[in-house]
């Protein structure tokens, strides 16, 4: 392959950037509601990264980036995670709901003008008004949620299901936030599928 040396990190030089590699819009899926015209995005904006180019020796099975990375909070006491609602026609943010921790939860939106999401270290699965973002309901699960909500109906009754179980990036980044803030967050492990019936 060919490389442009102007875009190759220089050894010994560092760059700061916000949000970090785990920020902005990460892997948890967003959802679009054609009735509201809004797209709902799980986002993590209030943290930054520092990358410094360095000489490294390749070791099979380990990270090999040629860089040292650090993690910092943009505002140490502020929120990190959000649900953002954006108007697809105007490109404007309509509302956001902020969380103290990262938001690793995929989003489900329904024809009943609701959105469902988990993803925060407090272990809550939440329902919000899709037009305003107002929290309408919450349920604390046994563990954190990094799964994606789904919905289905049986004999005309609508259900929403979610899998709880904390780990991977969510657990690692929670530990890094704790290190920055001088806190200790405990999120129990263990996977469970939760199913909730929507009211008639």
Which residue stretches match the model-derived regions?
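Beta-sheet-rich non-transmembrane sensory/scaffold domains
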Residues: 1-200
